[in-house]
Swiss-Prot record:
Pfam families attached to this UniProt entry: tRNA_U5-meth_tr
InterPro entries assigned to the protein according to its UniProt record, in alphabetical order: 23SrRNA_MeTrfase_RlmC (IPR011825), MeTrfase_TrmA_AS (IPR030390), MeTrfase_TrmA_CS (IPR030391), SAM-dependent_MTases_sf (IPR029063), U5_MeTrfase_fam (IPR010280)
Span of the signal peptide: none
Protein name: 23S rRNA (uracil(747)-C(5))-methyltransferase RlmC
Family per similarity comment: Belongs to the class I-like SAM-binding methyltransferase superfamily. RNA M5U methyltransferase family. RlmC subfamily.
Function: Catalyzes the formation of 5-methyl-uridine at position 747 (m5U747) in 23S rRNA.
Residue sites binding S-adenosyl-L-methionine per the record: Q212, F241, E262, N307
Enzymatic class: transferase
Keyword Heme: no
Binding site for [4Fe-4S] cluster: C3, C11, C14, C87
Length: 375
């Protein structure tokens, strides 16, 4: 992938950009095999990759510069701002949005937050696009609600310029820390969720709900999990750390009992909406801590699917699964190091299948799916 920002030394986020994709995949596969070297693996499936540029459905832009000439991008470690609107990871559809947002920031008087001086209002702009219909969700992260009235007043102009904006919100993040969002979300549009669709499964994206940033590869990840589950004798499963329900909604059948657990209420609202659209009445989604939910249960289903954050599922949940011994565990991980550590805590299982998904091209990161079977 050619990147003028990288070539000019202005951005180094894509550390592997000079390596061809096949070399990147080989290096990631070698890393994964090294991490799982102590565990026999029956089948290594071929790695899955997608487009090498224009694949991201989300932009997280630090706003800096002045209200008349805002910059959207990032801050270097020394505090120097860098505009990343031309980043080739973003699809072409993002360019006109960035172009319209810069004059809008001036129109609405949204002074960019100055980290060094602790002054200003607009901290971040978060943009998400639906692959299914091109609709977009835009979130303004502000220090306070001081400029809210001005923003509302200027909004008709933005709608006129960008009719693809289906969901617009203001998030209030008052703390002087590098935290992306606060607890308060103020909706400025009638719609509160962005419609998405993977493999004919309706999904919804709301503010403060996690959603994969590489739709092309994520849709293949969900489809693969679905195919693996369909090959197993499963009538009841848990989907822990379920997010908006991507895995569970793909894997569920009309007669399967499924419980999805996720701590974020916004994500659970999305999952419930999707389940209702699909007419799946045997699905239950609850906003709870996944470990606390699981360890409080006196019995387990045949299959437990886990998709934890980078820290992994942790020893308490591993110990519980070892004791309760479900027939199958499907582990989806964005951090193979913690996954390998967790697998070590599950000695009663063998690894039947492993597949790498190149969710994050040009970096050392990747997603991995494993199927573990009770010995």
């Amino acid at each position: 992938m050619q990147c003028a920002l990288y070539d000019a030394g202005r951005c180094r986020s894509c550390q592997w950009i000079t390596q061809p994709i096949p070399e990147q995949l080989s290096a990631k596969t070698a890393d994964l095999k090294n991490l799982l070297a102590d565990f026999p693996v029956e089948e290594w499936c071929a790695p899955v990759s997608g487009p090498e540029q224009g694949f991201r459905n989300k932009a997280k832009m630090v706003v800096s510069g002045s209200v008349e000439k805002p910059l959207l991008g990032m801050l270097h470690r020394d505090g120097t701002p860098e505009d990343l609107c031309d980043c080739p990871l973003y699809p072409a559809s993002f360019a006109p949005v960035f172009a319209a947002l810069k004059p809008f920031i001036a129109r609405a008087g949204l002074t960019p937050y100055n980290v060094a001086r602790k002054r200003g209002e607009l901290k971040y702009i978060l943009l998400t696009e639906s692959q299914s219909d091109g609709g977009m969700m835009l979130r303004f992260v502000l220090r306070s609600d001081t400029k809210l009235a001005q923003l509302r007043k200027a909004l008709p102009w933005l709608h006129e310029q960008l009719p693809q904006l289906k969901v617009i919100t203001v998030n209030i993040q008052p703390v002087h820390m590098a935290i992306m969002e606060g607890e308060t979300e103020i909706y400025l549009t009638e719609h509160q969720a962005l419609a998405e669709r993977f493999n004919d499964v309706p999904l919804w994206i709301r503010p403060q709900s996690f959603f994969q940033t590489n739709p092309a590869v994520a849709s293949q990840l969900y489809a693969t999990a679905r195919d693996w589950v369909r090959q197993l004798p499963v009538t009841h499963m848990w989907d822990l750390f379920c997010g908006v329900g991507g895995f569970g909604l793909h894997c569920a059948t009309p007669d399967m009992q499924l419980t999805g657990i996720e701590i974020a209420p916004e994500a659970i609202a999305c999952a419930k909406q999707s389940a209702a659209e699909l007419g799946l009445t045997c699905l239950q989604f609850q906003a709870l801590d996944s470990t606390q939910f699981a360890t409080a249960q006196g019995e387990v289903p045949e299959l437990v699917l886990v998709n934890p954050p980078r820290r992994g599922i942790g020893k308490p949940l591993c110990d519980y699964l070892s004791t309760m011994a479900p027939c199958f565990i499907i582990y989806s991980s964005c951090n193979a190091q913690t996954m390998a550590k967790d697998i070590r805590e599950l000695p009663g299982y063998r690894i039947e299948r492993v597949q790498l998904f190149d969710m994050f091209p040009h970096t050392a990161h990747y997603e991995v799916l494993t199927l573990q079977v009770k010995i």
